[in-house]
Structures are given as structure tokens and as C-alpha cells.
């Protein structure tokens, strides 16, 4: 497929009781900015931790499960593409490679058919600050 857009995202996490709050600030290569705030809860079911999350542009709840160093995070989201609002499904597979690096491969679908994918590399704290400041001047 063709590369459509590139972006960087700065993610800040805070704990509020049993809830994890993730603040995502996006900066796209064309200068567009976006923001998403997740509220994520965990629950133990049959001895395994399951996650559910909500954000303003998420339809229903996101569902997540962890197995080993991998997490699957699935949700329906409303995106604006070429000026048209489109609800799509994201299936994220996030793999923790080291304590400071994770790789996310997200598959995007509509009506059960794949329409795209997103690959992200997450760098934690010091690594991210040294390598990739969230600034278009350093694109």
C-alpha cells in the first residue's frame, strides 16, 4: 500500500484511583494536530486481566487483553478522512520489545474488510525526549 500520512504522538499517563488516564497529543506531517483522552479500567476475569476503555471519538468501549509481552486492543472509532466521517474498526497488536520500546501494528477495517494499517514505535521517557521531540521543525 501507499504511505498516506505520518504522525508523532506524545502520550502522558496518570492514575486516578483504579482508572488509567492516557492523554494522546498527535502531530501530523502536514501540521494538523489532534488529541484523544482515554479512560481505561481493568478487571480480573478467570485469573486474567482484561481492559476496557473509552474516549470521545470511540463508539462503545475498547476491549484489551494481555498475553505475555503482547496486548490486543480493539475498538470502533469515528475518523474524518478527506472531509468525510467514517466509522472504522481498529485492532491493535502491541508488543513490548524492551522496558522502553514497544511496537504497535494496527489493522483498520470497515464492514470486516481490511482497509489499511498503522505501524507505531513507542519510545518511553528519556528515549523519546532524546530522539523525537514533538515538533515539526525536527520532522
Predicted regions mapped to residue ranges:
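Central antiparallel beta-sheet cores of small beta-barrel/beta-sandwich binding domains
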Residues: 2-81, 93
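Beta-sandwich strand segments
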Residues: 2-4, 86, 114-117
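Short, charge- and proline-biased low-complexity linear segments
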Residues: 8, 12, 88, 108-110
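Short, well-ordered, mixed-charge alpha-helical segments that flank or form enzyme active sites
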Residues: 81-82, 113
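Helix-driven interaction modules
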Residues: 82-84, 98
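Glycine-rich, aromatic-bearing surface loops/beta-hairpins
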Residues: 91-139
Amino acid at each position: 500500500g501507499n504511505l498516506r500520512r505520518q504522525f508523532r504522538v506524545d502520550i502522558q499517563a496518570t492514575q486516578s484511583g483504579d482508572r488509567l488516564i492516557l492523554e494522546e497529543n498527535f502531530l501530523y506531517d502536514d501540521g494538523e494536530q489532534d488529541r484523544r483522552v482515554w479512560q481505561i479500567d481493568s478487571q480480573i476475569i478467570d485469573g486474567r486481566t482484561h481492559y476496557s476503555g473509552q474516549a470521545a471519538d470511540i463508539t462503545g468501549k475498547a476491549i484489551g487483553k494481555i498475553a505475555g509481552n503482547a496486548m490486543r486492543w480493539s475498538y470502533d472509532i469515528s475518523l474524518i478522512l478527506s472531509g468525510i466521517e467514517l466509522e472504522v474498526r481498529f485492532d491493535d497488536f502491541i508488543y513490548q520489545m524492551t522496558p522502553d520500546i514497544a511496537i504497535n501494528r494496527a489493522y483498520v477495517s470497515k464492514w470486516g474488510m481490511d482497509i489499511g494499517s498503522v505501524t507505531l514505535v513507542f519510545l518511553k521517557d528519556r528515549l523519546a525526549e532524546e530522539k523525537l521531540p514533538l515538533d515539526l521543525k525536527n520532522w
